[in-house]
Amino acid sequence: MAHLLLLHGPNLNLLGTREPEVYGRTTLAQIDAALVDRAQAAGHTLDCLQSNAEHVLVERIHAAREDGTAFILINPAAFTHTSVSLRDALLGVGLPFVEIHLSNPHTREPFRHHSYLSDKAAGVICGFGADSYRLALEAVIARLERDS
């Protein structure tokens, strides 16, 4: 059994109502509940945290180093394009992570095309709406099974 951590960046608490044509109508609570259930069905635990504050996400990443977390799933949202702090925290704890996006940043505004995390991620899944999270979790579960 592995302990997994799912982090959501700024404004993702508004999922379901914020720009549904871009992000869909599924709420963050619905996404989290489905992923917790799937992780448990695979014999793993999943903790979920959303924050609009960069330092809260950084501190939770630091805590993951000590709490037995085996893998981090992260939708950094707008921090994707701005946060050296998240990059440094993820590199500092040395845990594998998957970068997730609901939309495909490469089909959007040019400032969204660069990620400070992608080149260090075990994988990047984007463009599938709420299914991006499910696909990311399935990839993590498969990797954990392969590596065990």
Swiss-Prot record:
Chain residues that bind substrate: N75, H81, D88, L102, S103, R112
InterPro entries on file: DHquinase_II (IPR001874), DHquinase_II_CS (IPR018509), DHquinase_II_sf (IPR036441)
Entry EC no(s): 4.2.1.10
Catalytic machinery residues: Y23, H101
Enzyme's top EC category: lyase
Annotated signal peptide: none
Function: Catalyzes a trans-dehydration via an enolate intermediate.
Protein name in the entry: 3-dehydroquinate dehydratase
UniProt source species: Xanthomonas campestris pv. campestris (strain ATCC 33913 / DSM 3586 / NCPPB 528 / LMG 568 / P 25)
Lineage of source species: Bacteria, Pseudomonadati, Pseudomonadota, Gammaproteobacteria, Lysobacterales
